[in-house]
């Protein structure tokens, strides 16, 4: 039965029968291993000099997935794909029959399908049409696929299926594979750069007694043996700071973070970030470090600092623009929050420029931040450091050395998204206690993103933490930027989705 016109169930049943036939003939449809001498890319490079019609007697062994089959009587052409690329298999009945017996070519025609994984041994030639090919002397079924590949996968309107069956997406879409290769190169380059600068990566707990280091709702779990509630970490900050207290002067961790919050093209509940802490530095030093980390990633995978994201040209060449939050809001809206006397006046001014959802804003600083996020943030296309945030939304940052009510904090925005967050870290344990106790009061009042006081962290601070600059960069968003990917789901191999039985996509 041909795949064309057949249902998925019919195709599967037919392929199971083919697997049984192979088994009956003494050929396992699921091999244990294969001795491969060359990848497709290595062959394409090594034999690029062959002219059309030229052949060499070098014997090679290849393996990969059949992506296309064309059979013309006593001659067949298969496209074989491995991790490096594709190579054509040139299969003629006479050559294969001499090596494997008369039935081998018929088995090739009738028992193989697109999607199967095949091993082949042969010599090299370039066909008259210019296609480098392995002239197959013998072949072995390595894995019989039971389900068909889609004829056209990339470009389907049902993008959810691409995320849900990522393995199929990876098989048929080279661009997706390239995205994840670039992701690996970016993270490796960042680690290499930091290591060269004298930083050390230390792993901190994922399961934590207290959630802290960010204003975010945590995932909650339970340890049966200890009979205690635990949280999946929402940040690595507080443990990395403990390491600074302990005497490490340059530490970082690149790892997974978990936040029980919304899902969008910019947010996934499980994501990757890197946090970096440097003793005797402040947020000015962290701006320089941020530029270095991001440009390192860009040069690693793109070789240039002038990039394109979703049609927008972005120039990552340092130094990047720096503007205070107050000045950014003033320029965009005409509102000078430094001149507003009370919360009511701040809310009225914000509402006049179209800002919504101000009910939970209980200070002028929170209103300022809401205006910034709704009005200014989407306009920050080129790399921009926004500096000096209200103290009430930055409980772990050091007070600004010259601006009361503000802290030494910046966030980096590119293409209207936050890409990094940094502080001159708060090292005063008494001030830190007051801020964490305020958070605890907010939690008691029902704020799910606020947290209890982490007494052990405060104990660490009371032992003395040197002046420290801290930095966090979202790896997923950075990979989105450097691979021109519109959604965070495009750069996470297996993004969280609601099970199909529960009603499909979130």
Swiss-Prot record:
**Record keywords:** Aminoacyl-tRNA synthetase, ATP-binding, Cytoplasm, Ligase, Magnesium, Metal-binding, Nucleotide-binding, Protein biosynthesis
- Which residues make up the binding site for Mg(2+) 2? 418
Catalytic activity line of the entry: tRNA(Lys) + L-lysine + ATP = L-lysyl-tRNA(Lys) + AMP + diphosphate
Cofactor binding note: Binds 3 Mg(2+) ions per subunit.
Residues the record lists as binding Mg(2+) 1: 411, 418
Name what cofactor the protein needs: Mg(2+)
Question: One Pfam family of this protein, by short name?
Answer: tRNA-synt_2
Mention one GO biological process in which this protein takes part, according to its record: lysyl-tRNA aminoacylation
By what name is this protein known? Lysine--tRNA ligase
Q: Which organism is it from?
A: Thermosynechococcus vestitus (strain NIES-2133 / IAM M-273 / BP-1)
Gene name of the record: lysS
